[in-house]
Amino acid sequence: MLDAFSRAAVSADSSGSFIGGGELASLKSFIADGNKRLDAVNAITSNASCIVSDAVAGICCENTGLTAPNGGVYTNRKMAACLRDGEIVLRYVSYALLAGDASVLQDRCLNGLRETYAALGVPTGSASRAVAIMKAAAGALITNTNSQPKKMPVTTGDCSNIAGEAASYFDMVISAIS
């Protein structure tokens, strides 16, 4: 996993030059948004269980066959596995958002996810939809447009770029599942 600082050093080193120009501008932007990034990750992690359970409840309401006998989340064991998987995905998205780099998400979460779900018989359409619901919930929390007020102080300012970055990580998960 490379964070923004490591990426800048590797980029400069590969070209045999000092860190400068574009790398410094990128790092400056990353640092300037640091508190917003921390607030965004805090908002996601503080509300993780609600985000995941709402996503799973959402797919169950949209597709009642999931909770019917032989459905994707029919037994308690399958429901628990679905909730666990949602929390794992959300955790790795928050890691990527904190680092400003998707490699931890790619390496430790997405690599082989589609094949694993296929082998386990997980309905990929429903799993993708659950991730899309988590994406919407996380985006609302990051941009402070959720209906429930946050119970923590937040840095003021526009967080749409960080919300967009988080959305791109969720999109990577959806693409990996589909």
From Swiss-Prot:
Amino-acid positions noted as binding (2R,3E)-phycoerythrobilin 1 in the UniProt annotation, renumbered to this chain: 82
Protein topology in the membrane: Peripheral membrane protein
Tree of life domain: Bacteria
Residues that bind (2R,3E)-phycoerythrobilin 2: 159
Binding, phycourobilin: 50, 61
Gene Ontology annotations of biological process type: photosynthesis
PANTHER family listed in its UniProt record: C-PHYCOCYANIN BETA SUBUNIT, PHYCOBILISOME 32.1 KDA LINKER POLYPEPTIDE, PHYCOCYANIN-ASSOCIATED, ROD 2-RELATED
Described purpose of this protein according to its UniProt entry: Light-harvesting photosynthetic bile pigment-protein from the phycobiliprotein complex.
UniProt-recorded name of the protein: C-phycoerythrin class 2 subunit beta
Gene (name only): mpeB
